[in-house]
A protein has these predicted regions:
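Serine-esterase "nucleophile elbow" of acetyl-processing enzymes
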Residues: 1-76
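Alpha-helical cap/lid subdomain in secreted, periplasmic
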Residues: 43-46, 64-201
Length: 201
């Protein structure tokens, strides 16, 4: 049985839709990717055009497949940089792993010619104390990251370790436990853009 959060949401952006001369990249995630997507697009403006799909829906929920269909509709993507893991904590870790397998299957079916890069989930810290990891929630983030790494390694999909960058400096945090300051988003965008640029080269 799917147990959703009290409020679920999703967002779609397609930047520079008029550009046909550059490869198109799709970023998939939650509000974390929404925080750095425009910055990544700015950094890649001479190399690629960027779209992003962010959602609160957890893998395993059938709704995410309907959202994926819309995110991929109308464009051929050269690269998909994707994540899911900070929402849906009513979902057990075994169910998360099973749902992630189906999520990857769907992405590969929708973009069979694209390069795929998994981006792991970022840390959850104590609200107002960004130097402290949340003792209840962050261990689950780490376990989901471990499960995802095992899945991606078996499927020969590269893993982008954004967790290690996000956790490296409390100044990157906005202080709310989840999201990032301007400095943090700039740092995450620098890294993600570099990973994508290298993969497209």
């Amino acid at each position: 049985m799917i147990v959703r959060e009290s409020t679920e949401w999703c967002r779609f952006y397609w930047f520079k839709t008029e550009r046909k001369d550059l490869p198109r990249v799709l970023l998939i995630g939650d509000s974390i990717v929404a925080g750095y997507a425009q910055l990544v697009a700015d950094r890649l403006e001479d190399q690629a055009t960027v779209a992003f799909f962010s959602t609160s829906i957890c893998v395993g929920d059938p709704a995410i497949y309907r959202q994926l269909d819309l995110a991929f509709a109308g464009y051929d993507f050269a690269l998909v940089h994707f994540n899911n893991g900070l929402h849906g904590f009513t979902t057990t870790e075994p169910d998360y792993a099973a749902g992630l397998e189906g999520f990857v299957d769907a992405i590969e079916d929708l973009a069979p010619k694209a390069k795929h890069i998994w981006r792991n989930s970022t840390p959850i810290t104590v609200k107002g104390e960004p130097a402290k990891l949340d003792p209840q929630k962050n261990p689950r983030v780490l376990e989901r990251n471990r499960l995802a790494t095992d899945i991606m390694t078996r499927r020969e999909i590269p893993v982008d370790d954004l967790y290690s960058i996000a956790v490296s400096d409390p100044a990157f945090s906005s202080g709310d436990g989840y999201h990032y300051s301007q400095q943090g988003n700039e740092t995450l965008a620098d890294h993600v853009a570099q990973v994508i640029s290298k993969a497209l080269s």
